[in-house]
Amino acid sequence: MASPAVEIALSHIEAWSRHDWEKTRELLAPDVHATVTTTELGFRGGDLNGVDDYMERKMKAARLIEPGSVEVLSTVGDERNALVTVTFEIGLGPGGAMVTMARACLYLIDDHKKIKEERDAFFLLKK
């Protein structure tokens, strides 16, 4: 059985990857903060602050993901922290072609069982 933080993280990943925006928002603390980083040339990371900023950017990015393509590679966590690695298909290839993204997501869960902090690192797998 997964830890409480891993369960919340997996529910969140499932929600945004299937474009369930209500559930995605429901799992966020009001003052959520996320940082996205990558080693991919031509892509920039960024910081997302608060639910509205988070949802705006998450919805824009997640719309490029092929629903149902998320594959969970590994999870580890405890009551408040979760680390999840996943791959999924996303339309970031030439001309919007689907490519595989590898992503590591680190979460901090608050006392209300909401995502307070998220750290994402990603790269595109070369075939």
Describe the predicted segments one by one.
Residues P4, E56-K127:
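A beta-strand edge to alpha-helix "cap/lid" segment located at domain peripheries
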Residues A5, I13, A34, E40, ...:
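N-terminal/domain-start segments enriched in small and hydrophobic, helix-friendly residues
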Residues E26-E79:
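A solvent-exposed, acidic/Ser-Thr-rich amphipathic alpha-helical stretch
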